[in-house]
Amino acid sequence: MLFRSGCSPVAQAFVEGSDTIRPVKPSTIAKSLAIGNPADGYFALDVVRSTGGGLAAVTDDEVVEGMRLLARTEGIFAETAGGVTIATLKRLAAEGVVRPDERVVVYITGHGLKTLEAVAPHCGPTATIAPSLDAFRAAFDIEEAS
């Protein structure tokens, strides 16, 4: 499971071995995950514990790095929640919670343009182009195949 360290009451309870989800004031670039008092937190804890899963809280810097990693390796520009997912998987793999021989499915459903303002300082400028293949080719300096 994934949680952002600026908003990770479920991960905190997991680390403490507690069933009590203590509300927090969210502070994260991952706005879609900024839920300081998750209604289903206890159920999330139960699922992780009953399946032998793991939880991790990641920093905003790790979120941005997760987004960059996904863009660089898969060509996918995910929103910040997707960056949280990748950063968490990376952390759990480094900690040995996820083993190299395991198959893992990571759901990335939100496009990076949804949260561009949160990562703009880390990603550089964006280009606005006309909605045409020629404009796309020109923006990326791609020559038409003959």
Model-derived features: positions:
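Active-site-adjacent helical/loop segments in soluble small-molecule enzymes
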Residues: A39-R99
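Short, low-complexity, polar/charged sequence segments that are solvent-exposed and flexible
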Residues: D19-R22, G52, E74-F77, C123-A127
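Phosphate-binding loop/pocket of nucleotide- and phosphate-handling active sites
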Residues: R22-V24, I86-S146
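Generic beta-strand/beta-sheet core signal
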Residues: F3, G36, V58, E79-A81, ...
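Exposed alpha-helical structural elements
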Residues: P9, T28, F43, E62, ...
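Glycine-rich phosphate/pyrophosphate-binding loop at beta-loop-alpha junctions
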Residues: M1-S50, H111-V119
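Short glycine- and Lys/Arg-enriched binding-loop motifs that mark or flank ligand-binding interfaces
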Residues: T28, S32, A71, A78, ...
